[in-house]
UniProtKB/Swiss-Prot annotation:
The organism of origin for this protein: Arabidopsis thaliana (Mouse-ear cress)
Residues spanned by motif Microbody targeting signal: 399-401
Gene: AGT1
GO-annotated molecular function: alanine-glyoxylate transaminase activity; L-serine-glyoxylate transaminase activity; L-serine-pyruvate transaminase activity; mRNA binding
Domain of life, per lineage: Eukaryota
Protein purpose: Photorespiratory enzyme that catalyzes transamination reactions with multiple substrates, including asparagine. Functions exclusively as a catabolic enzyme in Asn metabolism. Involved in root development during seedling establishment after seed germination by regulating serine homeostasis and acetate conversion.
SUPFAM superfamilies, alphabetized: PLP-dependent transferases
Control of this protein's activity: Inhibited by aminooxyacetate and beta-chloro-L-alanine, but not by p-hydroxymercuribenzoate.
EC number: 2.6.1.45, 2.6.1.44, 2.6.1.-, 2.6.1.51
Family statement: Belongs to the class-V pyridoxal-phosphate-dependent aminotransferase family.
Required cofactor names: pyridoxal 5'-phosphate
Name of the molecule in the record: Serine--glyoxylate aminotransferase
Tissue: Widely expressed. Preferentially expressed in green, leafy tissues, root cortex and epidermis, developing siliques and dry seeds.
PANTHER family: ALANINE--GLYOXYLATE AMINOTRANSFERASE 1, AMINOTRANSFERASE CLASS V
Length: 401
């Protein structure tokens, strides 16, 4: 029996964890195995090869850590940098704030570039810092690709353009937790040195895998890194890669089989089709928000996210009450506003293995909730705006043509 049972399917529309597809659930429904047997290394080898495809890299080296995105952050930092190293890090929302907190606690010299919440990274400030850094004291640029607290997406290619323009050797470390497998991400083309994601986001798996991919330049940086690391030491993994056994400690067998199934689904749909689907869902959600007479927390079109929409509420309405009522009355999970935007926004997650009709159900629920809390929404307005757009843009399902 569920701890808090509700009839029918629960509607999960937070920006992670996300819905898990049935084939993935079935793939994970298995007993434990001996990870030292030939089967698990053989499985792991194919996973590592295929994970590179979702990062769009041919030269990167992937690592599958039994952890969350927070552990993946730590792995990226401690394997490439030394205590006291200067980092330029962008603060644009709650999750970039948490990464910066981790950087400081790991004793890096963090040069914080802060923007108003709802804005993207201030690249003009970065350009100024790079132009003045003739001695190359900046060792890394840390940036969150998609900030789920505010629904803001940063332009990673523009960061690489600045680094190249100033011929600066700083490493580019990118949090792609809520973007990889949902938004356009090109590790090799954009010159990303370390990219990372988490299994519970667009991969549509349970929480528990922190997936990190390192460029050859990042691997070279491990030779001079003096940060203390044990659990997240890339060199331990690389040693077992060479042995062909792949695991320095016990992996989650069930998550590995789940990852295999998740990647198979991604390749069946096609990564570019998945990116296009997320673009449709994001556009439909924004049209609904506009029809309701509400505003997006994201302040410019160039920063909009196609994986999450943070919806601003009027001052007399508490965004957390919308989230509470969604769960209590409608069996719907929406995202809370966090930190500076707590109570000021609620968030609609539209990432992972989710389709257009599922989204329309969520939007219908939000309309009822808005009416419940006293907002004068015109019932059906957002659903009509979204469905009119989607009806003209949903493609045929390739496997059913």
């Amino acid at each position: 029996m569920d701890y808090m049972y509700g009839p029918g399917r629960h509607h999960l529309f937070v920006p992670g964890p996300v819905n898990i597809p049935e084939p993935v659930i079935r793939a994970m429904n298995r007993n434990n195995e001996d990870y030292r047997s030939p089967a698990i290394p053989a499985l792991t080898k194919t996973l590592l090869e295929d994970v590179k495809k979702i990062f769009k890299t041919t030269s990167g080296t992937p690592f599958l850590f039994p952890t969350t995105g927070t552990g993946a952050w730590e792995s990226a930092l401690t394997n490439t940098l030394s205590p006291g190293d200067r980092i330029v890090s962008f603060l644009i929302g709650q999750f970039s704030l948490l990464w910066i907190d981790q950087q400081k606690r790991l004793n890096f010299n963090v040069d914080v570039v802060e923007s108003d919440w709802g804005q993207g990274a201030n690249l003009q400030v970065l350009a100024s810092k790079l132009s003045q850094d003739e001695n190359h004291t900046i060792k890394a640029i840390c940036i969150v690709h998609n900030e789920t607290a505010t629904g803001v997406t940063n332009d990673i290619s523009a960061v690489r353009t600045l680094l190249d323009h100033y011929k600066h050797p700083a490493l580019l470390l990118v949090d792609g937790v809520s973007s990889i497998c949902a938004l356009d991400f090109r590790m090799d083309e954009w010159g990303v040195d370390v990219a990372l994601t988490g299994s519970q986001k667009a991969l549509s798996l349970p929480t528990g895998l922190g997936i990190v991919c390192a460029s050859p330049k990042a691997l070279e940086a491990t030779k001079t890194s003096k940060s203390l690391k044990v659990f997240f030491d890339w060199n331990d993994y690389l040693k077992f890669y060479k042995l062909g056994t792949y695991w320095p400690y016990t992996p989650s067998i069930q998550l590995l089989y789940g990852l295999r199934a998740a990647l198979d689904l991604i390749f069946e749909e096609g990564l570019e089709n998945i990116i296009a689907r997320h673009a449709r869902l994001g556009k439909a959600t924004r049209l609904a928000v506009e029809a309701w007479g509400l505003k997006n927390c994201t302040q410019k079109e160039e920063w909009i996210s196609n994986t999450v929409t943070a919806v601003m509420v009027p001052p007399h309405i508490d965004g957390s009450e919308i989230v509470r009522r969604a769960w209590q009355r409608y069996n719907l999970s929406l995202g809370l506003g966090l930190n500076k935007v707590a109570g000021k926004v609620f968030r609609i997650g539209h990432l992972g293995n989710v389709n257009e009709l599922q989204l329309l159900g969520c939007l219908a629920g939000v309309e009822m909730i808005l009416k419940d809390v006293g907002y004068p929404v015109v019932m059906g307005s957002g659903v009509a705006a979204a469905s009119t757009y989607l009806q003209h843009h949903i493609p045929l399902i390739p496997s059913r043509i």
